[in-house]
């Protein structure tokens, strides 16, 4: 069932694109109140420029200035070349055509200091993807033993590092602040993405690209999943604060940087890159950066499923703060978090998606090493993506856990079982694909994740739910990758912000029911907590924090106006009231 009218002819793609102005004019509750179902598909680790920067009509890569693109070293001097560490991008195997002497250690590279198309060097057909559970810190050379998809290595994406990389909105220290050096400047050909191709077929669903959408918090997946559901950084209660091995506080230098192992950054003092913020009130505490007992980098939960072998001292104590699930339940609105591989990981024997038999051992060959039946997580199941599993209210054995923490396979069943007159989806659904299907660099390919995303959208669109369901596809965080738009609070950029973020701009697209337009671009400023604001406004819930109280909700997505189409080759500057 389609939301709007499709293109009668593919040639009509050249017709006018619709757009929304950056300055939200207030909430359009009329449209929002007609939405009976909200679906949030939370993908992984890509910046907007990295993935959607070539979409027509958006503030994309063509709008980036040379000053933003050109990366500088720790001293502020522009690199001549981009050093690469991924084994498919180093020289050799690529011919060294660029020589750099801007740092203490000269190097040669095949890459000058600019953006580059990853697919030119690592095509989708390349068998560079690891088998589930294989860790390759600098990627894998093509081999029949690997999986296809054109995988790259992973790139660091952590709390203090990202703040350094943003450089007060200059956007020019992604490379210096990274463990992957020049890979930060890579991008994917937007028009080759499965999601792009799906949304450019005849009779595609009506959709909106939001090109001013920022990750809620600086850093990585763990923290941004917490901001997705609670709009706050979680507190680690009772941490050790004595400088011992069990002290999980970070130590940063005068620039706010916590790591001494990266190719181009050399700390000015002793540093420590750990789970928590820097401690407050110590001689080492650096003013101007978050301090305290806040968990900001990857932390394991107190409850199963957590990564096998995790030391108890490193597990985040159960959280008691309010979250969006609590508020929805109190209001009587149905909801669920659907995670790929959840029933295997949580030991829900026989539930949808269960693949481990009757015991006494985990029988799925792709089970995480060291797993003990019945907790049989997939080898690339990401424990820190299970945001509600950190909360006391959803601990094992509770009705709330059984009712609301579900397997992605069940979401598909509900959509497919919906009738012409009844949509079986919950009022609010969060979907978190398993690692092999979530687009995260390092352990899966962009194409594999994008294909899975298309299948999810087709499942929703093929059901009666499409007529009253607002679908949002967005990404938890930037994955360490460059974007040219300064987040709110960086270098004077306007918008809601605080010491936690928001961070780098990320892709976001909506499928909009009953739209009169095939395609719109919304230039309104959003961040991850706009998801919360939208749910809160739709169901008359109180804000969870000052951030979700201040940001725009998605009402403006429905307010499209005609705008001139301009694609990646159009150098006309993006016009927006917030830039």
PLM-predicted stretches and their roles:
Residues 1-4:
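Positively charged n-region of N-terminal signal peptides that target proteins for export
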Residues 7-17:
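Bacterial N-terminal signal peptides
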């Amino acid at each position: 069932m389609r939301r709007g009218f499709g293109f009668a002819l593919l040639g009509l793609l050249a017709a006018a694109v619709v757009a929304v102005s950056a300055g939200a004019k207030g909430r359009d509750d009329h449209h929002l109140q007609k939405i009976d179902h909200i679906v949030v598909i939370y993908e992984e680790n890509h910046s907007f420029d990295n993935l959607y920067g070539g979409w027509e009509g958006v503030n994309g890569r063509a709008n980036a200035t040379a000053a933003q693109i050109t990366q500088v070293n720790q001293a502020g001097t522009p690199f001549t070349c981009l050093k690469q560490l991924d084994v498919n991008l180093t020289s050799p195997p690529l011919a060294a055509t660029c020589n750099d002497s801007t740092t203490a250690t000269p190097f040669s590279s095949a890459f000058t200091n600019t953006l580059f198309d990853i697919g030119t060097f690592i095509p989708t057909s390349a068998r560079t993807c690891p088998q589930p559970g294989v860790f390759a810190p600098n990627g894998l050379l093509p081999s029949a033993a690997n999986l296809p998809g054109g995988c790259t290595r992973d790139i660091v994406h952590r709390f203090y590092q990202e703040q350094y990389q943003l450089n007060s909105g200059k956007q020019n220290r992604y490379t210096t602040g990274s463990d992957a050096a020049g890979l930060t400047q890579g991008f994917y050909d937007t028009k080759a993405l499965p999601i792009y191709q799906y949304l450019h077929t005849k009779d595609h669903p009506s959709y909106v690209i939001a090109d001013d959408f920022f990750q809620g918090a600086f850093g990585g997946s763990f923290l941004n999943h917490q901001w997705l559901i609670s709009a706050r950084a979680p507190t680690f209660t009772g941490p050790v604060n004595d400088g011992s091995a069990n002290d999980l506080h970070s130590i940063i230098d005068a620039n706010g940087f916590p790591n001494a192992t990266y190719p181009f950054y050399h700390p000015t003092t002793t540093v420590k890159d750990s789970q928590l913020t820097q401690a407050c009130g110590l001689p080492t505490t650096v003013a101007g950066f978050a301090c305290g007992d806040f968990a900001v980098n990857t932390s394991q939960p107190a409850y199963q499923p957590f990564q096998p072998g995790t030391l108890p001292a490193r597990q985040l104590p159960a959280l008691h703060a309010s979250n969006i699930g609590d508020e929805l339940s109190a209001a009587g609105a149905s909801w669920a978090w659907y995670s790929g591989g959840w029933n295997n990981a949580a030991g829900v024997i026989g539930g949808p998606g269960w693949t481990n038999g009757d015991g006494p051992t985990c029988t799925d060959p792709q089970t995480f090493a060291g797993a003990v039946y019945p907790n049989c997580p997939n080898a690339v199941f990401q424990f820190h993506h299970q945001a509600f599993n950190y909360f006391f209210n959803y601990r094992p054995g509770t009705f709330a856990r059984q009712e609301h923490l579900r397997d992605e396979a069940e979401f598909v069943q509900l959509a497919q079982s919906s009738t012409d007159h009844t949509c079986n989806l919950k009022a609010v659904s969060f979907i978190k694909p398993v690692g092999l299907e979530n687009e995260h660099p390092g352990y899966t390919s962009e194409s594999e994740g994008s294909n899975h995303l298309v299948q999810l959208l087709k499942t929703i669109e093929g059901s009666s739910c499409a007529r009253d369901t607002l679908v949002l596809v967005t990404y938890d965080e930037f994955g360490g990758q460059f974007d040219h738009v300064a987040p709110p609070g960086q270098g004077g950029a306007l918008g809601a912000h605080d010491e936690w973020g928001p961070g780098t701009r990320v892709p976001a697209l909506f499928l909009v029911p009953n739209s009169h337009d095939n395609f719109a671009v919304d230039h309104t400023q959003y961040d991850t907590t706009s998801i919360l604001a939208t749910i809160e406004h739709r169901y008359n819930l109180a804000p969870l924090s000052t951030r979700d109280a201040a940001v725009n909700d998605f009402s403006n997505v429905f307010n499209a106006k005609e705008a001139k189409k301009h694609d990646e080759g159009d150098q006309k500057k993006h016009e927006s009231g917030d830039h």
